[in-house]
Amino acid sequence: MDTLKDKIRSEGIVLSEHVLKVDAFLNHQIDPQLMQQVGHAFATRFRDQGITKIVTIEASGIAPAVMAGLELGVPVIFARKYQSLTLKDNLYISKVFSFTKQTESTIAISAKHLNAHDHVLVIDDFLANGHAAKALIDLIGQAGASIAGLGIVIEKSFQDGRALLESEGYRVESLARVKSLAGGQVEFLD
């Protein structure tokens, strides 16, 4: 997606050979027009898959997931990273390790929102080593739901997330595939 790549080039900040900061338009401040285009791109790629729900993880996956949900006309569920007073009973629970934060979190989805009749599109802001995606896949599996595929806004192709997911038979659609962050420069795969 050329618009996304242009935005990454102009506003993304390479913090290291493994970390790309995109808080100017994706995971702190959000560019609504760009997110609308992102949602449209995901909807175009998965429109014929019979999607009934979109699942993401709070917080950075919410904007692209909501825009895709709007385009596809389906609800969006975001896995919460902590249990609250209102999210405590009848939960699907998994653990996820954050590459960026270097911490493990517990994530949860209420069982009343996801069931075996659902066909799910997973959307997330980044794919690095696949830990967040695998945790979401675990939650969806606990519900007995099926997975149409994964929509990733930015994939760090130099990490093994895609290979891990594809080796397990999952379809991965990434809108921007970063080949390298070496020398403080973003180089795209395609």
From Swiss-Prot:
InterPro entries: PRibTrfase_dom (IPR000836), PRTase-like (IPR029057), Pur/Pyrimidine_PRTase (IPR050118), Xanthine_PRibTrfase (IPR010079). Xanthine binds at residues 20, 27, 156. It comes from the Bacteria. Its EC number is 2.4.2.22. It is found in: Cytoplasm. 5-phospho-alpha-D-ribose 1-diphosphate binds at residues 128-132. GO terms for biological process: purine ribonucleoside salvage; xanthine metabolic process; XMP salvage. Keywords: Cytoplasm, Glycosyltransferase, Purine salvage, Transferase. Its main location: cytoplasm. Pathway: Purine metabolism; XMP biosynthesis via salvage pathway; XMP from xanthine: step 1/1. Pfam families: Pribosyltran (PF00156). It catalyses: XMP + diphosphate = xanthine + 5-phospho-alpha-D-ribose 1-diphosphate. GO terms for molecular function: xanthine phosphoribosyltransferase activity. One of its GO terms (cellular component) is cytoplasm. Homodimer. NCBIfam families: PRK09219.1 (NF006671), XPRTase (TIGR01744). Belongs to the purine/pyrimidine phosphoribosyltransferase family. Xpt subfamily. Converts the preformed base xanthine, a product of nucleic acid breakdown, to xanthosine 5'-monophosphate (XMP), so it can be reused for RNA or DNA synthesis. This is Xanthine phosphoribosyltransferase. It comes from Pseudomonas paraeruginosa (strain DSM 24068 / PA7). The gene is xpt.
